[in-house]
Amino acid sequence: MINIRIKKLTQKGINVASIKRAHHDFDIDTPNTDSYLHRKAGSKQVIVSSSKRWAKITELDNKKEKRIEKLLKKLDNTDIVIVEGFKKELHKKIEIINQSNENYLFNEIENVIAVVSNSKLNANLPQFKKNEIDLIVNFILKY
């Protein structure tokens, strides 16, 4: 769902970056490549670079996750950042509700600016259906 919005924004000429919070350990490297082996040997940071893209992989010693403000500073040349996760952070949020339950984020925090759900909710916020992609993208751009 977020991928569709990113695609629509980029089609409008917007330079989009995204940040995704992982709730589990993850690895974007491929086993047995040089960069993977550098990390396994003890390198705390590895940069992999080609003519098409580059990536920086940083190993965290303290197991403490980076705050969104620190991660945002790592981005450059972007018009908008789409963030998935980081519910407790202070940035503005559009809550996407996939199933019916009563523990809505918009009831718990003040920085939800809109809701996306196929159900009508008792929320004093702009509400969109999941298939209203253009309306959601335009809302984001105007906000």
Report the location of each language-model feature.
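Structural motif corresponding to alpha-helix initiation and N-cap regions
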Residues: 31-32, 65-68, 130
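Anionic group-transfer/hydrolysis microenvironments
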Residues: 22, 51-52, 61, 86, ...
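Short loop/turn elements that form and flank the Walker-type P-loop nucleotide-binding site
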Residues: 42, 76-77, 109
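Phosphate/Mg2+-binding loops and adjacent switch elements
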Residues: 80-142
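Phosphate-binding/switch loop-helix module in NTP-utilizing enzymes
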Residues: 59-88
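N-terminal phosphate/diphosphate-binding loop that engages ATP/GTP or pyrophosphate donors
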Residues: 3-60
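Short secondary-structure boundary/capping segments
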Residues: 37-38, 72, 104-107
